[in-house]
Amino acid sequence: MVKVWLITGCSSGFGQEIALAALAHGDTVVATARDPTKLKQLAKRGALTEQLDVLDSDDKLTERIEKKTGGIDILVNNAGYILAGGVEECSRSEVEAQFNTNVFGQLNVIRAVLPVMRERRSGVVANMGSIGGWHGSPAAGLYCATKACSTILAESLRQEVAHLNIKVTSIEPGYFRTNFLSSGHKTSATKRIPDLAAGVDGVHAGLEAYDHNQPGDPQKGARLIVEALTGSGRCQGRELPARLSLGSDAYQMVSGHIDRYRTDLESWKDVTTTTDCDA
């Protein structure tokens, strides 16, 4: 059965690759971006294209899509970017912009699409999280915070709409070879604090060196995302998890964090469990 996808942030990177993979799967794709002129290649491949800034409230978007396609089966909340800078270095306006796109933008789109899915009693919502949502990182703390927030929102929504046959997940990619870390996609805090250099400069340099040297293949990742969200191919018969960590590096990172969290939990258990009421 042909599915209708709504994907945000399709001008490049994962958004573009997921759109192409969904088209190759035989589905209908509504690809969106702030600048629709950057969607011409997807349009040539058969995608329907729409202008969408996730910060704006477009109450008519879902209505236009329904008229064109008959509904929306799968939403991929992909639009986002990374703000690089120490927590203290990032200004209020820079932090607000990061949260507006990465968190509130996802909420805007969810609020627009969920009424359609609730009415049909079916649908899939996928927030694009990140492996960064599992841990804080020097020089990327605000980005990591937005991705942790995105994932927790998805986990909460998942429980709220499960009885309506709507599935929700957070896709958490590791490092994939897209333009995400390139100039124009990654922004940096304007302020630099010399006292923090020892804590953040290594990460700044590492992100620059890692650009286009990431281990993940975005085309392979996109194909797996399509299979997971449609329950097809390698994912047939599997229940869509609350968190879908993507990439061999993501597996290693998550495994390591779980082990460290468990160690800390157990090592403090003798004192942290002594705070209950006596009776």
Per-range role (PLM):
Residues 11, 19:
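N-terminal Rossmann NAD(P)H-binding glycine-rich loop of SDR-like oxidoreductase domains
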Residues 44-57:
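Rossmann-fold cofactor-recognition segment
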Residues 86-87, 94-96:
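Substrate-binding pocket helix/loop in short-chain dehydrogenase/reductase
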Residues 110, 146:
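Active-site helix of classical SDR
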Residues 130:
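Residue(s) in the substrate-gating loop at a strand-loop-helix junction
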Residues 163-239:
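SDR active-site lid
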